[in-house]
Amino acid sequence: TDIPYGEVNRKGNGLRELDKENADILTFDMQVFLNEVYRVTKGTIIIFCGKEQISEIHKFFSEKQLLRKGTVRQIIWKKTNPSPMNGEHIYLSGIENAVWFKKKNATFNAFCKNTVFEYPIGSSNIHPTEKNHDLIAELISDNSKEKDLILDTCCGSGSTLLMAYKMNRRFIGFELNKSYYDLAKKRLDAEMAQMRI
């Protein structure tokens, strides 16, 4: 899942700031979220997050690791074509972070694989933080089997759900933003109709 970590406004030139009108991060309770996701997950948890959130998420799962309830790692998505946003003022942000936690005995199909994944950014421009479909497919393949259930608690435009469906996984997704919910539903309905042909 890709939790809220703030949207920037798109107006004007120069440095962009947090768009407080659309920032779910201001009302997002990380500890409640982590406890609930841990409680309902049987296998692996992957949480894409902002750099400011890594420590809190990693600490939560490190405590579970100390109790021998699983293993935690940081995943890095190295973007081969980072967005040039603010590039005239600062270094480009060429990576995205995720925290990966595998509960004991969970599926893992990626023998001796590195935690750095190199892919271009998503190309559809339908969501500001859309993930590359091949990246999502690789993570699903590495951490699940066919017919497993994929949960995306912040599904945005539905990319993870779409890839889960294409890879013969069951899925459940949640999205608070009505526009993104409608878009995700439309994408999934179209894919399901196409697969039935």
In which residue ranges do the predicted regions lie?
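Core catalytic lobe of class I
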Residues: 1-182
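S-adenosyl-L-methionine
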Residues: 185-197
